[in-house]
């Protein structure tokens, strides 16, 4: 396999090397330093959790994203954004990024329609649903158990059984 860096709430991780973080998404200078360091180490892919704060503050300006994933809006960040509308606008910035090739969108979330409309022209959109919404990838026959959830994933690429220890 090829090395992949991970940046998020738990810090910046590459294999067993973990650097703690004070923010989900580092400030712009620290982020660019981390990406440059990993590039010098041969890393060609990074999975990054990008907060709405970071989008609003320009912390990821200059970063070209190949894929963006939208999960949901919650009330967690209203203290910063002031309204759900402002929070949503901040999230949309990621999907309007030049160079975006793929957008993965939670069709179960009410804001999904606005996200899909904001996706930059030419990007492939894949939707997913755990609640039966019309989507490209759907959870079917979900069975919630004490140890987690199991079910089937139906998609244009086929059907697969899954088990997740997360409820």
Predicted regions and their residues:
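Short phosphate-binding/catalytic loops that engage adenosine nucleotides
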Residues: 2, 43, 123
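Short beta-strand-centered segment that lines the nucleotide-binding/catalytic pocket of NTP-utilizing
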Residues: 2-15, 50-51
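Short acidic, glycine/proline-rich loop/turn micro-motifs
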Residues: 16-20, 164-165
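Conserved nucleotide-sensing/catalytic segment adjacent to the nucleotide-binding pocket
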Residues: 19-51
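Acidic, Mg2+-coordinating active-site environments of NTP-dependent enzymes
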Residues: 47, 56, 65-167
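Switch II of P-loop NTPase G domains
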Residues: 52-62
């Amino acid at each position: 396999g090829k090395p992949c860096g991970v940046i998020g709430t738990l810090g910046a991780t590459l294999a067993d090397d973990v650097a703690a973080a004070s923010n989900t998404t580092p400030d712009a200078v620290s982020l660019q330093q981390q990406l440059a360091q990993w590039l010098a180490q041969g890393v060609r892919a990074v999975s990054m959790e990008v907060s709405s704060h970071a989008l609003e503050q320009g912390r990821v300006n200059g970063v070209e994203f190949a894929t963006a994933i939208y999960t949901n809006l919650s009330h967690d960040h209203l203290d910063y954004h002031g309204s759900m509308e402002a929070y949503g606008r901040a999230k949309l910035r990621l999907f309007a990024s030049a160079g975006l090739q793929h957008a993965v969108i939670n069709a179960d979330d009410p804001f999904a329609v606005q996200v899909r409309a904001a996706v930059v022209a030419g990007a492939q959109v894949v939707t997913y649903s755990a609640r039966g919404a019309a989507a490209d990838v759907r959870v079917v026959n979900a069975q919630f158990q004490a140890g987690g959830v199991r079910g089937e994933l139906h998609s244009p690429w086929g059907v697969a059984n899954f088990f997740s220890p997360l409820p």
